[in-house]
């Protein structure tokens, strides 16, 4: 089988969770005898030295150039005789699906790597994250931002409904990370969900009440430094407020380039 992964950035496993999972999937599919290709929008020269398991190709135009990229996408599927497309960022690429449906026997799987309503639920927090000045004008601006939140959430939900409507129009399967996200998905797309599947985390571990190793008074964060999803800034802000009360503790942040 010829399998094509599509995602905006290359699958360097140190870049993030989606990239690591995709790298592992590519290797496993290849091990099982399948032919795997990857198609991206961004060519990152700083990550070209990694031994990617599958050949990487790139869209010739910006993401917003849907018609041009769509024609390229269809030609690419034909040239490489792709049987299955695994889209790791459906909200970016669903506008290309219609170009593949003129071809026979191309199966599309759209993978959602987050809660479909995750940002919607916390949009108010995002809007209010930047604290204004403690002045009359600063307080007026804060009130204005609070008043705008319902409209921002309304507009954002309509955008989600449009995006997911486009995804379901052509995809053969939509994969969630958990069946617990189905109620939120239902709020966005309330039609037939028979094509929805979920692959939850298969790893379960028993609670460890007693351990033999010595513990340090250390708070350890391991992950990429990214604001919207990881909220590392909030962790640092909290630590800034409390660290003087706990002088024998330390906060350690480890990310892909070091410590």
Set out the residue ranges of the language-model regions.
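Glycosyltransferase donor-sugar binding loop
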Residues: 40-43, 222, 250-259
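N-terminal subdomain of nucleotide-sugar transferases
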Residues: 1-43, 80
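Active-site proximal beta-strand in glycosyltransferases
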Residues: 3, 84, 102-146
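A short, active-site helix/loop in glycosyltransferases that binds the activated sugar's phosphate group
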Residues: 145-195, 205
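Acidic anion/phosphate-binding donor-loop and adjacent secondary structure
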Residues: 186, 194-217
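A conserved mid-protein helix/loop that constitutes part of the nucleotide-sugar donor-binding site
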Residues: 20, 24, 227-241
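A structural motif in glycosyltransferase catalytic domains
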Residues: 22, 29, 219, 234-236, ...
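Short His-centered aromatic/hydrophobic patch
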Residues: 87-93, 112
